[in-house]
Amino acid sequence: MYGITSTANSTGNQSYANRLFIYEVVGLGGDGRNENSLVRKSGTTFITVPYARMNQEMQRITKLGGKIVSIRPAEDAAQIVSEGQSSAQASAQSPMASSTKIVHPKTTDTSVPVNIYRPKTPFLGKCIENYELVDEGGSGTVRHVTFDISEGDLRYLEGQSIGIIPPGEDKNGKPHKLRLYSIASTRHGDMEDNKTVSLCVRQLEYQDPESGETVYGVCSTYLCNLPVGTDDVKITGPVGKEMLLPDDEDATVVMLATGTGIAPFRAFLWRMFKEQHEDYKFKGKAWLIFGVPYTANILYKDDFEKMAAENPDNFRLTYAISREQKTADGGKVYVQSRVSEYADELFEMIQKPNTHVYMCGLKGMQPPIDETFTAEAEKRGLNWEEMRRSMKKEHRWHVEVY
């Protein structure tokens, strides 16, 4: 039975480049082709776009002042509506015209949004939420920051990241470079209205080796101190395909996290157990092993424990609290310690073809975890290096460490 513990394939090789998608666009200039055309403030245009040109077309539409309200594979439409039709013609010929609800296709390579907003043309988001996640007695500062993105076309999937460009200049007089942060919300946002994106941000601070002074990270400090209401936060992205949640609603998902590496897994678990959106009903198994220094540093603790209590057959929650717990030989308990403790059970799980393993956080956990699985593989006459290589090829082994 799953619960809380704190003690010791691809289906085909079709060429995606040949697939077509239909963009439903409002407010586009003229027939949607000529950049000098007057912008039409009302009416819907349907544009057929080859997969290979999806990003370029998004940029062109934005430049023309249009807004994409839905994207669908062409084969899903009752019929392809030609470019430049009026809204009246479109509604008479296509069921898509009657709704402006954003369509989020299944997570395949053809539908992963990437670089909708770039550093030279970032989206300006508005901070609508910024609160502390570390309880009294914990170490450091971690904030949950939410942005309103309703005025743009930013779309994302669980497991992706966005970039934040802090204001100001560096010591050389150049604009600060962007920093990437894993998204902590589902594709529908914390409000489940497709209008927000959330981050889990730890304020970076360290001692200068020469002066001994405390140095604070530029972007993390900017975000952690960002006032609610700030409406000019420069956002880029989304980026990333390595950490995407599988579409399989019956999958087994093992998540290994330290600190703010919890961000993508919060998005996963919200989608699995809290959101229960009509487009995804999780029926598989999820196991989160979460490493922190103190109990007070367990981010989103109440929410995770509530989900585990309400879904005991589907969600298992295990903590590794390094400065409060001890291993059998008296050592500190880390994520890799828990993996070693449950090695036999975990290894049996990852041999199943529908099991995905995700690792996010400090890179120090990766080598000992590999050592543990190497030993388990040898017990069974298997080669872990070959197994891991095969899992990566099958998109079942996902690592994002730093």
Swiss-Prot record:
Domain CpcD-like: 18-74
Region (Disordered): 80-101
Record key words, sorted: Antenna complex, FAD, Flavoprotein, Membrane, NADP, Oxidoreductase, Phycobilisome, Thylakoid
Organism: Picosynechococcus sp. (strain ATCC 27264 / PCC 7002 / PR-6)
Pfam families registered for this protein in UniProt: CpcD, NAD_binding_1
The name this protein goes by in its record: Ferredoxin--NADP reductase
Source domain of life: Bacteria
Gene Ontology cellular component list: phycobilisome; plasma membrane-derived thylakoid membrane
Catalysed reactions listed for this entry: 2 reduced [2Fe-2S]-[ferredoxin] + NADP(+) + H(+) = 2 oxidized [2Fe-2S]-[ferredoxin] + NADPH
GO molecular function: ferredoxin-NADP+ reductase activity
EC numbers, comma separated: 1.18.1.2
Domain FAD-binding FR-type: 120-245
Residues at which FAD binds: 179-182, 200-202, 206, 218-220, 260
Species classification: Bacteria, Bacillati, Cyanobacteriota, Cyanophyceae, Oscillatoriophycideae
Cofactor needs: FAD
InterPro entries documented for this protein: CpcD-like_dom, FAD-bd_FR_type, Flavoprot_Pyr_Nucl_cyt_Rdtase, FNR, FNR_nucleotide-bd, FNR_plant_Cyanobacteria, OxRdtase_FAD/NAD-bd, Riboflavin_synthase-like_b-brl
Family: Belongs to the ferredoxin--NADP reductase type 1 family.
